[in-house]
A protein has these predicted regions:
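A metal-dependent hydrolase metal-coordination microenvironment
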Residues: 1-121
Length: 121
């Protein structure tokens, strides 16, 4: 039997600009019955390793945020230690390539942002 999975792929905690601690956010996601969640704090690896907490999968992630735009990295530790300036699109590309090599899935946030110079090619 096929099943739909409920989850959220873009969550922030008090480690960046969210209003809940990681523990509280995990608890709230479990309360509403999510199957998975990805904490994507800005430029910070809040979840050090993906894991199950009861029946809910907590996936490691991070939102790379700087002048050129915002990119989510899911499922692998971002290979840099903040603070790390990402001043150019080339800086992002290098970090994204390194993240992919580490096994991450990449998601471009806000693709129609007028001041984010990513090219959708």
């Amino acid at each position: 039997m096929k099943k739909w999975y409920k989850g959220d792929t873009h969550l922030h905690t008090t480690n960046s600009d969210g209003n809940m601690t990681p523990e509280k956010l995990i608890s709230e996601c479990k309360k509403i019955g999510l199957d998975y969640m990805i904490i994507t704090d800005h430029n910070y690896n809040t979840i050090k390793k993906s894991r199950f907490d009861g029946d809910m999968l907590i996936i490691q992630g991070q939102e790379l945020t700087d002048e050129p735009g915002h990119v989510n990295v899911w499922g692998a530790k971002v290979p840099h230690d903040p603070p790390h300036k990402l001043d150019t699109v080339d800086d992002y590309k290098k970090l994204i390539d390194a993240s992919r090599e580490a096994g991450a899935t990449i998601s471009l946030n806000h693709p129609f942002c007028s001041n984010c110079p990513f090219l959708l090619d």
